Amino acid sequence: MKKILIVGSSSDISQTLQKESFDFINLTSKDSEFNILDSSTFPKIKELDGLVYFPGTVNLRPFSNYREKDFQKDYEVNVLGLINILKHYQLSLNQNASIVTISSIAANFGMPFHASISMCKASVEALTRSLAAEWAPKIRLNCIAPSLVETKMTERLTNTESKKETIENKHPLKKIGETSDIANMISFLLSDKSRWITGQT
């Protein structure tokens, strides 16, 4: 059974993913000693067949209302944390290991009030592509960039029927994503069924 490290294991999508048939190791900020910006708090793991990085932010506001520390916090969670994890566990990854990162549709489409998150997630996609080329053929890296998915983190964006309808109508399929939609894609990318896919978003 593949051994998979999940970073941000308390997220709703992560909880759905953990119903799949993998041997999961969980890291979450709810662990008192774990700090995504401090690699000395990362547990030692000898071997891994895969890694999924979930930590993210939903910090939407007009550009004029952002403070420097808002951008900094979003970048730390979305990008620097990912870099720290990848650097720390690179040598633990087995041959043919698979890494899945999480971006957002906002990284590639201009959306109002998304200045900070779009910048951060574009960085995640660029890093994923770069490392996919650098770490091939031993390790595969792919990124998922979903539209809005119903989770606790996004519930303030969908907490009325009017809000939900507006968001649904913007999507070609006229519906909001569910956690299982993303978990199924991650499961596929972690599996050998995607063994000829790397560097994709």
Residue positions per predicted region:
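Alpha-helical segment proximal to the catalytic Tyr-Lys
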Residues: 91, 132-137, 195
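Active-site helix of classical SDR
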Residues: 86, 120, 128
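Substrate-binding pocket helix/loop in short-chain dehydrogenase/reductase
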Residues: 62-63, 70-75, 163-167
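C-terminal substrate-recognition "lid" of short-chain dehydrogenase/reductases
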Residues: 175-201
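Canonical Rossmann dinucleotide-binding motif of NAD(H)/NADP(H)-dependent dehydrogenases/reductases
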Residues: 1-25
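Residue(s) in the substrate-gating loop at a strand-loop-helix junction
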Residues: 104
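Active-site loop-to-helix junction immediately N-terminal to the catalytic Tyr of the SDR YXXXK motif
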Residues: 66, 110-118, 130
